Design a protein with these regions (language model features):
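Charged, low-complexity, helix/coiled-coil-prone segments
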Residues: 1-4, 25-42, 108, 124-136
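Short, flexible, basic/aromatic active-site loop/helix in glycosyltransferases
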Residues: 1-18
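A short, structure-level motif marking secondary-structure boundaries and short turns
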Residues: 13-15, 36-39, 78
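A short, conserved alpha-helix in the catalytic core of glycosyltransferases
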Residues: 19-27, 31-36, 41-69
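Residue-level signal for well-ordered alpha-helical scaffold segments within enzymatic catalytic domains
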Residues: 30, 34, 55, 95-99, ...
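Active-site-adjacent helix/loop segment of glycosyltransferases
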Residues: 58, 62-131
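Membrane-interface aromatic/basic loop that binds lipid-linked glycans or pyrophosphate carriers
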Residues: 135-177
Length: 177
């Protein structure tokens, strides 16, 4: 699922390690070093924030949200789920699973599977079936009317299409004329 949103109050503790997002975070350099920093096995996009948040939580450090904290980030076109980072998401999902014994980025992986980009492999990982094409990019691209791209909206649309497809396959066959 998507990350939890900010708290109702100005400051709130988040008990879910997935709240960590390196787009905007603060801690002392000493604490960062004591925690071990970011795991260098994560290459490219995907999973590195979740891993760092999990590491912080595993060491007993609390995560806090600060509502209204300002972060300036250079605009760039992006996609959610990030189909344009398919290869690194797949590789990093495996790094996370090997390290923590459980998967991460399941919502993205589910969407990639529904798009026909990947399938599960017998070892519990994922096999890439194809690179994303323009229709995948169009589906996941941030739209002008949206403040951000949303994996949840894309996944809802894909799940709905899958349900309609499965419902159609279960419909009784028409009798021959």
């Amino acid at each position: 699922a998507d990350r939890a949103g900010p708290p109702r109050d100005m400051v709130g503790r988040c008990g879910d390690y997935r709240c960590f997002w390196s787009l905007n975070f603060a801690l002392s350099a000493r604490t960062f070093q004591e925690v071990g920093g970011f795991d260098p096995r994560y290459v490219g996009y995907g999973g590195e924030d979740t891993d760092f948040g999990r590491t912080v939580a595993a060491q007993g450090l609390p995560l806090w949200w600060v509502r209204g904290a300002k972060a300036y980030h250079q605009y760039h076109k992006h996609h959610m789920p990030p189909v344009h980072h398919l290869d690194s998401v797949l590789a990093n999902a495996q790094v996370f699973a090997d390290k923590w014994g459980e998967p991460t980025m399941q919502h993205w992986l589910r969407a990639f599977r529904l798009m026909g980009l990947i399938e599960p492999d017998p070892a519990g990982g994922w096999t890439k079936l194809q690179d994303p094409v323009e229709s995948h990019l169009a589906l996941t691209r941030q739209q002008e009317h949206q403040p951000y791209a949303s994996s949840s909206l894309v996944l809802e649309q894909l799940e709905s299409q899958a349900r309609r497809g499965s419902d159609a396959s279960r419909a009784p066959a028409m009798a021959p004329a």
